[in-house]
Amino acid sequence: MSRGAPFPVPCPVLLGTFTDDSLEAQLHEYAKQGNCVKLKKILKKGVCVDAVNTQGQSALFVAALLGHVKLVDVLVDYGSDPNHRCFDGSTPVHAAAFSGNQWILSKLLTAGGDLRLHDEKGRNPQAWALTAGKDRSTQMVEFMQRCTSHMKAIIQGFSYDLLKKIDSPQRLIGSPPWFGSLIQGSPNSSPNRQLKPGIISAQNIYSFGFGKFYLTSGMQLTYPGSLPVIGEKEVVQADDEPTFSFFSGPYMVMTNLVWNRSRVTVKELNLPTRPHCSRLRLADLLIAEQEHSSNLRHPNLLQLMAVCLSRDLEKIRLVYERITVGTLFSVLHERRSQFPVLHMEVIVHLLLQVADALIYLHSRGFIHRSLSSYAVHIVSAGEARLTNLEYLTESQDSGAHRNVTRMPLPTQLYNWAAPEVVLQKAATVKSDIYSFSVIIQEILTDSIPWNGLDGSLVKETIALGNYLEADVRLPEPYYDIVKSGIHAKQKNRTMNLQDIRYILKNDLKEFIGAQKTQPTESPRGQSYEPHPDVNICLGLTSEYQKDPPDLDIKELKEMGSQPHSPTDHSFLTVKPTLAPQTLDSSLSAQKPDNANVPSPPAACLAEEVRSPTASQDSLCSFEINEIYSGCLTLGTDKEEECLGTAASPEGDRPNQGDELPSLEEELDKMERELHCFCEEDKSISEVDTDLLFEDDDWQSDSLGSLNLPEPTREAKGKTSSWSKTDEYVSKCVLNLKISQVMMQQSAEWLRKLEQEVEELEWAQKELDSQCSSLRDASLKFANAKFQPAVGPPSLAYLPPVMQLPGLKQPENGGTWLTLARSPGNEREFQEGHFSKKPEKLSACGWKPFTQVSEESRGDCSELNNQLPTLRGPGKQSTGEQLPSTQEARESLEKNTNQNSRSMASVSSEIYATKSRNNEDNGEAHLKWRLAVKEMAEKAVSGQLLLPPWNPQSSAPFESKVENESTPLPRPPIRGPESTEWQHILEYQRENDEPKGNTKFGKMDNSDCDKNKHSRWTGLQRFTGIRYPFFRNHEQPEQNEASQASCDTSVGTEKFYSTSSPIGDDFERFQDSFAQRQGYVEENFQIREIFEKNAEILTKPQFQAIQCAEDKQDETLGETPKELKEKNTSLTDIQDLSSITYDQDGYFKETSYKTPKLKHAPTSASTPLSPESISSAASHYEDCLENTTFHVKRGSTFCWNGQEAMRTLSAKFTTVRERAKSLESLLASSKSLPAKLTDSKRLCMLSETGSSNVSAAFVTSTHATKRKSLPRELAEATSQQHLDELPPPAQELLDEIEQLKQQQVSSLASHENTARDLSVTNKDKKHLEEQETNSSKDSSFLSSREIQDLEDTERAHSSLDEDLERFLQSPEENTALLDPTKGSTREKKNKDQDVVEQKRKKKESIKPERRESDSSLGTLEEDELKPCFWKRLGWSEPSRIIVLDQSDLSD
């Protein structure tokens, strides 16, 4: 086992590693260790001998660097590449030179190692040897010099015996003899062995560090591939031709020279005199191209003829076949003036040849990678060759790509390179397809890809995700090729080279067929007549280049050139006039229409060049080429015809005379039409006025040249008749082409302008019609009157609409929104406004519309305002966090003080209107009284039936259910502490099909529920909504706030307006006030108010309609018991009467200090007798007067609102309103079970028309955790009322201790129950499943619900006498929460009430229920104890219900 010597100096590179334990990793490990035996075993297993590590280093590089001689021999024998490039460009030859071991370097040189290669820093192996230290580098440098000297001697013509004696670098190791004495080398390298010249074999191939070569039979030193190696003196400049050089890429230059009397083109590196060291690496490109060109043979690849080495062997030049024209890039962009006409069949023929060369490369496993117009060389007329193979990569069997130079593509070629090549990723066959497609676009549009953008900018653009696109000006078959070929992703480049070649070949056949049948015409307006002389199609003769009349061709070419052409600036200065010159007959025969071109057209063309317009840019150069080539062919045909009839020119003149007037007439007609079209185009729009003026001037200049043949006709003796005709025809063709392009552009402009005008007119009409419909609707709404109720309600009963007269419009003018509600509106609104845009407009029916003020009518961006979120106080707008309880309470009281005065000002007007509407029919009153009496009797006997909660049982709406689709559920808005539901009011429509496409802010439409039960989810989420309606008022306003109780959170009711433009908003309002037959409309109006960033909504709440299409789900936080409580409330009795209040009643502000219950009990065991009702009426009048409405303004909505708020409140004139108050009283007096209370919701809202009772709600520490009540709320509320209640009795404190012991055992069950009742996403899904199961049997009661109902009935039985007492002593109850009334009376009344309630509850509780619900029963009893919560400071589970009524004396 050989060991490498340690490095005395730092190594130029770091050795790479492996991240896994593969065979390749073991190979490198054994190479480091120098273990030859194990290395052979690994190689015999078939591992890749050139496997690389993380630095791109092969095992041979590692072994050579560490000086393992035996391992180097083994790896070379197994075929390892001595010129393998690492990631830094170094090779094993560099490593061997650094190691200082001459035997290792000689072995690598014999295997083909090259001493001329450089790393990325420009260092060759000799430079690496010098870095190893003087002791080790001296002998190594001398060895490399001996190899160089020996190679020079062989090239300079030393005798064959010299190569015969020293045939291997190993013979040069040690003290070098001067080509005489020999040093014994390898036993296999015998100097006496016989060489067989002319036979290429392993023994006849030599290598001394300058490439492998062999001797031919003529004793010619030849590289493999039979490439002669010549000296630099053998290639010289020809005497009969000028020097001609051109660039063949960013670093290479090609020069036409002569070698051995053969005209060749020599390619060499173009470097400055003193290049930077990194530039020295570019010399490797020629070596790589030499290697590839010597191994590849194809007719369309540029043929490499010889390799020229300099005397010092530092420079290398490649000798290729003669290139006559140059690169395609130079023809298209650098010397285009010399080649004004490129025939289409020539272009296609060139592209076919390039495609064939690429197909050959791909078949050999090579990828060009640097294909561009620089790589395409036009060697002769119509003959192209592909070259520039220095960046060629080879695909190996393993799938990897071998890059000889490992040099990145230069930035100058990024304009043609595929995105993966630019980003230095692996190139594939489709990378060459991309570059070939770019060349097709370049040659047909005369524009450099990426508009000549710098390569570095191209890379940045591609990195940002921008890619090259196909030019729309390309002809049809080529546009498809380019569009598919230059796609950014390789997988989308579906067209391969064989397909492209097939399309090009068929297109070329069509060209040739069109040329034979119609020599003067073609599908593209150009001639394809073959020219025997290449000068006609490529303009190569010197006479053609020196011809002054050719300037007009240059000018014609410049008209169509692209603005980014690199040579545009050189053609902008041309002479305005050209003097007529006498041309040779040969030139006249070739260019007949150039001989007699008058000076005015040239001046006209020069003027056009000096003032280009947008229309000129549209004329690309290949279109001008087609036009002009057609003129050339036409002139040639005319010349031949003229020469054929030269014997009788007299007979030919009449035909010419007839032809000229006809041409003049056609041209005059075309001129008039163009001028008329331009004048018409100018009158359409003023947007493109300047551009049209420029186009019109350009047309005038172009057409002005058509009138110039007048002096030509006068000078008939100077010109022949055929030249005049040809002049007319050429001008006609040119102007016709220009006119066609301008016509197309003008037509496109006209079409766009007409569309814009139509859109504006349509929008104006829609705006006018919708404004008129809005005014008509307002008049209809103002005159709408509804009759009072005439009978008891049914399940489908709808309360009538109340209207308020005399309310003025807002100051901003027209920013109120009027909405209507009818059966099924929630479902229709869900279906219509969560679905697609309406396909037709409804003639009648309610449609949402956005408020539009006159100032912002035209601004559609401001029409996306949403209706204000209807919230209770204490809740911020969507997305905002809950404020602190102290801030919420202060804001609530502040809003109450601000609004109480405005409410009182409106109350008398409301009452007067309502009293006028109470003149009911006597028969109707009789029916109502009978119904009330019957209902009361049922209530007394306990037989008052529960209305079914499932609206599907309602018969009147079954037909409507069939025609309506399933609505979408309301998406929740999740706050920090509670989950709020958005409630959307729907608008009544005449037809049942969904209308309108309304986009709602912050709405999620993805959770569409396709089940039928989801129709009711929306309404059930209206948390305690009531609908009192007002009649005969012009502008009813809807001011809604959500009710909240200790068991449910504040329901967030959010009204969304459409986010569509103004047209869509107004069209949904057309005929929106039409009434639906069989139903009564309910009208609401949302008013926007601004007041200290608070959303203030006065609240006559909505009464939930118990019908099939209107009823929807309550909030998910409500339990089944609460659902039943709503359905079994006293609203059935409330709807059955019409008893008025006194007119002198008024409203008075009352501050609520405790959260309220918002639902009435399920049933009442104590019915209301006529006496109790009449006695309660006076109390409730003052209760309603003292009601205040606490609303909060959402800060996220900014409407054109008014500064002051109009507070709308009403005195309810029926038993329905009084019963509603009773309902809230019962709900306040009832002690709900703790497990059904969801204290997570914030409950600090007031309720209008329901009750003025404020419930102080207290929970213990355990109850707070169980119910998720925010502790801040509890502390804030307790501190507020801490000093208002008397101290607790001693007996209550004793019972508290007993209560604590009972709660220990029942705490776990309560926590589980509260957790089940929390509003979570899992609960939402569970509730929806329950709704689905109950939609068939119309039942939603489970075993838990039955138990809850029993608890509720038991609670109601204890409140009978309390209710009567509360109704008879409102003053005392009011004083309970009024701190100004004195604490003595408050303490007395509360102590008496609590003792009485406690006694009655103990008697009513059943013995068997006491054991199972001991903790709950204790809670119900202790919560009514007067003052124990004050001492405990909310630390114990308790709940005090304080009943508050207005003072009648006030």
From Swiss-Prot:
The Basic and acidic residues compositionally biased stretches are 992-1011, 1383-1397, 1404-1413
Q: Keyword annotations for this protein?
A: ANK repeat, ATP-binding, Cell cycle, Cell division, Centromere, Chromosome, Cytoplasm, Kinetochore, Mitosis, Nucleotide-binding, Phosphoprotein, Repeat
Q: Where is this motif: D-box?
A: 889-897
Effect of inactivating the gene:
Male mice are sterile, due to the absence of intercellular bridges. Intercellular bridges do not form during spermatogenesis, and male mice are sterile. In females, embryonic intercellular bridges are also absent, mice have fewer oocytes, but they are fertile.
Q: What's the record's remark on domains?
A: The protein kinase domain is predicted to be catalytically inactive.
Q: Quaternary arrangement and interactors, per the entry?
A: Interacts with KIF23 and RBM44. Interacts with CEP55; inhibiting interaction between CEP55 and PDCD6IP/ALIX and TSG101.
- Give the protein's biological function: Required both for the formation of intercellular bridges during meiosis and for kinetochore-microtubule attachment during mitosis. Intercellular bridges are evolutionarily conserved structures that connect differentiating germ cells and are required for spermatogenesis and male fertility. Acts by promoting the conversion of midbodies into intercellular bridges via its interaction with CEP55: interaction with CEP55 inhibits the interaction between CEP55 and PDCD6IP/ALIX and TSG101, blocking cell abscission and leading to transform midbodies into intercellular bridges.
What is the name listed in the Swiss-Prot or TrEMBL entry for this protein? Inactive serine/threonine-protein kinase TEX14
The scientific name of the source species is Mus musculus
The opening ranks of the lineage are: Eukaryota, Metazoa, Chordata, Craniata, Vertebrata
